[in-house]
Amino acid sequence: MADIDNKEQSELDQDLDDVEEVEEEETGEETKLKARQLTVQMMQNPQILAALQERLDGLVETPTGYIESLPRVVKRRVNALKNLQVKCAQIEAKFYEEVHDLERKYAVLYQPLFDKRFEIINAIYEPTEEECEWKPDEEDEISEELKEKAKIEDEKKDEEKEDPKGIPEFWLTVFKNVDLLSDMVQEHDEPILKHLKDIKVKFSDAGQPMSFVLEFHFEPNEYFTNEVLTKTYRMRSEPDDSDPFSFDGPEIMGCTGCQIDWKKGKNVTLKTIKKKQKHKGRGTVRTVTKTVSNDSFFNFFAPPEVPESGDLDDDAEAILAADFEIGHFLRERIIPRSVLYFTGEAIEDDDDDYDEEGEEADEEGEEEGDEENDPDYDPKKDQNPAECKQQ
């Protein structure tokens, strides 16, 4: 038995010697090839990958990994850079305050144009032929003869129809053309919004805390007695002491609506529902009437109140976040460019912006696909652990 074991050991030793001889004869290229194959096998092992990722996380993905390993003297210099960054944020805050002052200054220059817009929409002023002259891009190649023919046909159509005053349903059309606003407008809101004459933005006075007010001007109507509905947005342009590096320009801190004086039976923000209740003992049935909230654009003027603690439930936070977005959109886009949202041209421009971003993303995807087809491509080399974590 011992002889058999010795024989097997001798054969094993001989095999190892043969392997060593073969390895010595292998070229450098073969050694590299085997190393590459071994690397591929390791990268396909989930346990090895997990261990490697954990180590990378400790070094790079968590800030403390690399930063904590720095010498103390280097950490001191990093702290100095942080203090410089705080000062940069403070300067940036002053920059935005001056931008707000410029907006207030130029609002005065814009106002005569917006006043003329208001007068045309509401049939107070009839623009002259010269003011109405407009040459769309598609008319560049149209002959004078065709233009004259089209003009005559338009005049005939105008004669057949009754003469409308101003631009009917201007603001309602704007709202319905913009997804962000049309989602808020219910069918029962539309008859009321037909009475909307104008939307204005007013900025806070110099030296006052940053804020702006949206004014919705209505003509007399059968729904409420208010001539103007307002929404005030309070803003802040200063870094938060507890987190100065998060500063990214002015932010809306809160908003206040107004009371709508609804006429009797015309409040579209409420609805009455009837429920039948059956008595368990006697079996009798009674009808109970209850008033509950109703979806409406006019809920925009009754935002959730923020308690002194600042704590809000998830629903209230979502409503306020959407409210702030809408207020900013009305101020920055709708009011200054309303005619382009009425015609739909601004919406097409917005869509083009999104399309360009989508095309860039598609091109990046194609490039990534080409890399994945490369047998020597290692996706781990291209990944930035910090970016992956943020996603």
Swiss-Prot record:
Locate the lipid attachment (S-farnesyl cysteine).
Answer: 388
Q: Any idea which residues bear N6-acetyllysine here?
A: 116
Q: What is the effect of changing residue 126 to A?
A: Impaired binding to histones and ability to mediate histone chaperone activity
* Gene Ontology biological-process entries: DNA replication; nervous system development; nucleosome assembly; positive regulation of cell population proliferation; positive regulation of neural precursor cell proliferation; positive regulation of neurogenesis
One molecular function GO term is:
histone chaperone activity
Q: Which residues are modified to Phosphoserine?
A: 10, 69, 143
Q: Which Gene Ontology CC terms are recorded? A: chromatin; cytoplasm; melanosome; membrane; nucleus
Q: What's the name of the protein?
A: Nucleosome assembly protein 1-like 1
- The species this protein belongs to is Homo sapiens (Human)
